[in-house]
Amino acid sequence: MSTSATADAPADAPRTTTGLGDRPAGLARTGAGRSVGLLVAVAVLVLAVGLSLVVGSKPVPLGTVWDALTGYDGSGDHVIVRDLRLPRTIVGLLVGTALGVSGALIQAMTRNPLADPGILGVNAGAGFAVVLAVAFLGLTDISSFIWFAFAGAVAATVAVYAVGSQGRGGATPVRLTLAGVALAAVLGGISQGITLLDPQAFDRMRFWGAGSLAGRTTEMAGTIAPFVAAGLVIALLVARPLNAVALGDDLASSLGAHVGRTRVLVGVAVTLLCGAATAAAGPIGFVGLMVPHVARWTVGPDQRWILLYSAVLAPVLLLVSDVVGRVVVAPGELQVGIVTAFIGAPVLIALVRRSKASGL
C-alpha cells in the first residue's frame, strides 16, 4: 500500500464533494477543528453510555449506577446495572463501532454513497447460517448463534469475491455490488422459505432477525472484541490509500496506490467488522449507511477522519436508539434494529432526493 504524500493529496482537495451534495469540504476544515469535533463526539458518546446504564423500564439513579460499578452488593438495582445494562452497553459500543467503520469502508471502496456493509452479502450470509443452525441443529441460545453467524458472513463474502472477480478487470466495485445483491437475494429467499416451513425456527429467529441488544452478555462481547479490533486495525491501515482509490482506479494506480490489495483488505475488514456485529446483535440497518455521511459532511473526504468519526458516532446512534426502544413501549421494548430503521429511513429518503449527491 502506498503511503506517499501524493496518494494522500486528495484528502485536502478544497472542492471535493462529500457525498451529501456539492459541498467543498466538511464543517471542520482544519486539523484543530476536526480534533475538537472528535473530542465533542467522544463526550457525546460518554453521555450515551451513561444514558444506556441509567434509562430503562426501571430507571436507576446515576449515583446507584456508580455504586454498582465500583461496589457491587447484589441488590436489585445493582443486578440490573451490572448483569443486564452494562453487558448490552458494551456490546452496543462494539457493534456500533463495527457498523460505522465498515459502512465508511464500503462506501469508499465502491464509491457509492448509498452503500452499506450488507452490500457484500454479509448480513444475508450470517442470517442464512443462523437459520440453518436453528432449523436443523435446534439451537436456541443467542450466544450459540455467534459462530454460525460469523461463519456465514465469511462464506458469503468469499462467494461474492469469487463471483465478482470473474472476467476481465477483476473485482471491480460494480461487479462486487451486483454479486453481493444477487447473493443476498438468494440467501434471503431461502432463509424465508425455511422459517415459513418451520414454525419453531420462525419463532426463534424473529427477535434476532430484527436486530437487538437485549440479553447480550459480557462473554458475547469478549467473543466479538478480537474480530472488531482486527477489523479496526486493517481499516486504519487502508485509510490513506482509500483517499486515492476514491478518485478512481486508474488515477489511484498512477498515484502509487495498490488498488487491488486495498480492495481485498477493505473486504477483509468489512467482513470482520460487519460479521462480528451481525453475529452479536443480528442484522441492524441504516447505521452503516447514515453515520459515514454525517462524518463526511463534518470533516470532509479524508478517510482517516471519516473512519475516526464513524467509529465514535455510530455507537452513539446505536446506544441512543436502544435507550429509545426501552422507554417508548415500557415495560416492553422495541428492538434496536426497528428504532434505527425509523431514524434512518427519513435520512435515506433525503439522500435519494438530493440529485447532486454523488460518490466520494
Regions found by a protein language model. Name each.
Residues S2-L360:
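Alpha-helical transmembrane segments in inner-membrane proteins
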